[in-house]
Amino acid sequence: MDKNLNQLLKWSIEAQTAANAGQSYHSNGAPTPNNNSGPATGTGAVATSPAPQVTGSGPRPVDPEVLASLFGGPSEAELMKAAMEVITDPSPETTRENKLIAFDNFEQLIENLDNANLLEELSLWSPLISLLDHEDEDMRYHAAWCLGTAVQNNQKTQERLLAMGGVPKLVDLAMKEGESEKVRRKATYALSSAVRNYQPAMDVAADEMHKRGHEVLVNNGTKVDAADMDKVDEVIDVLRNKAKSA
């Protein structure tokens, strides 16, 4: 039997058992005696016996994911697409507040490694990276945040970010004069996630920083090893310090 169907069947059996025992349940699972469980009083009244005692706290609540699976709730991939549609909707009917809420939801979804890997399949890399250029500071901030989350400890997404031109954009955002500190710090976070243990991204980031007047080399003149966390930290610290001076 399907796992979800099995869980729903168990819940149904527990609920039916409770009903047969003459119990009703509050929404929090606490049992409540029937109204006629106590002795009746008054002329002509007939006494009734107490309702049977039932141990336990009633049927366990059904897992929402089980119900969603059984009854056609949206998948997480569909939720990701829907969130991006809200974020990029040009209609004035979609408020800025709703866009930022959608961004929060999107970021939480791509914390899951499998969901982050779906960005390519769902064609979401391009719109996400393009939001680094958005006129709204908070939109740029959330775009950098989501990119940092998507590529953290994930070479597959690190490769896609680099291939889609995201690394130069993040370096530009992290070092851009006039950009707010919070946006620069979030772009730095995204770069930190993008370059660690992925040499191609480290090399591109170093080249972009060099173009902007900062040489990223170790003492012997060689490139920074992306697997050397101490050296990577030194590079990232340069960007963090520049962000503080914004």
Swiss-Prot record:
ARM-type repeats, residues: 48-92, 113-152, 155-196, 214-244
A GO biological-process term: regulation of translation
Keyword Cytoplasm: yes
Subcellular location: Cytoplasm
Major place of residence: cytoplasm
Presence of the UniProt keyword Cytoplasm in the record: yes
GO molecular function, one term: adenyl-nucleotide exchange factor activity
PROSITE patterns the record matches: ARM_REPEAT
Segments of this protein annotated with the region Disordered: 23-63
Assigned GO CC terms: cytosol; endoplasmic reticulum
Domain of life, source organism: Eukaryota
Keywords recorded for this protein, A-Z: Cytoplasm, Repeat, Translation regulation
Ranges of Polar residues composition bias in the record: 23-40
Function: Functions as a nucleotide exchange factor (NEF) for Hsp70 chaperones which accelerates the release of ADP. Required for fully efficient Hsp70-mediated folding of proteins.
Family: Belongs to the FES1 family.
Entry protein name: Hsp70 nucleotide exchange factor fes-1
Gene name of the encoded protein: fes-1
